[in-house]
Amino acid sequence: MKSGKVWGETELVLQTPFIEFHRIWVHQGGFCSLHKHEFKWNMFYVTSGELAVHTHKNDYDLIDTTVLGPRQWTTVKPGEYHSFEAVHDTMAFELYYPEPLSKISLERQWEDIFLNECNTSR
């Protein structure tokens, strides 16, 4: 379902406990206010138009602007203030996801159980 925004429209494509995936349409000159996501990464992938993503670094000391065209993307780290604005009418995908899982996010126990059962059945 599409929702109207001051800057255009957004449509929720997929939501799970781990990600939120939105399609956004931003009118030329449309922009979102400065904000941050405390624990989520924010990724923008542009399919048409041009989107400028402004990220505030070093407690506002530096504003990093990335202008994205079709098939280009960028990410914003958790806790970074950012905003976006459309240089031209833009369609993009916006993805939110939590801090990356640790590399050791899977613990297997079946191997030990299987080996123990094999050894005790002899």
Where are these regions (language model features)?
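Structural motif
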Residues: 31, 50-52, 73, 81, ...
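A generic "binding-loop/recognition-motif" signal
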Residues: 30, 39-40, 80, 88-89, ...
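Short acidic-glycine-tyrosine-enriched beta hairpin
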Residues: 57-81
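Glycine- and acidic-residue-biased ligand/ion/polar-headgroup-sensing regions
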Residues: 39-58
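Double-stranded beta-helix
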Residues: 3, 85-122
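A short glycine-rich, His/Asp/Glu-containing loop-to-beta-strand
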Residues: 1-36, 40
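Conserved hydrophobic/aromatic beta-strand scaffold that supports enzyme active sites
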Residues: 21-25, 43, 65, 73-75
